[in-house]
Amino acid sequence: RETGLVASSVCNVHHWAKPLSHPDAAVRQEGIDAMIVAMEDEKAYGTDAVLLVPGIVNEEVSYDDCWNRSTECIKELIPTAEKLGVKICIENVWNNFLLSPVEACNYVDQFESPYVKFYFDCGNILVYGWPEQWIDILDNRIGRIHIKEFSRKEADSKGRGAGFGVSLTEGDVN
């Protein structure tokens, strides 16, 4: 606050190591606990949104298990979000989950809570679709937006991560 900079959101840094989709309930609880700390931190930083990667689909965690486990955990987090007046914003990343805007809408809508929103990342989504289409469909479910560039051409020729190595307006974000 002394610098005049305003934080838009806080990121729960433990969502990759302690995913809410993990097969072990103890690990999921650690993920819940980390989210509670992040929500308390965001309030202290003067923002009202925390970024959350809700889960990871892989060989050990099926899509439906990721959906069900992460849903259960987020339902446990909603009362804390309500109490603190902060939003849990689900981000689209390369976690093999919520691969279409319709799935993302259904996921957010199931909570029936104004404290669960979507953290839309224009660059991340270019692997799965077109940002403008997702934005139109997600509509008022979007709580925050990450704006960054991504080049499909660079990703195709040099590896997926290389897609981020371009300046704004030089990639495929419309």
What are these model-predicted stretches?
Residues 1-72, 87, 124:
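Structural motif corresponding to the early beta-alpha repeats
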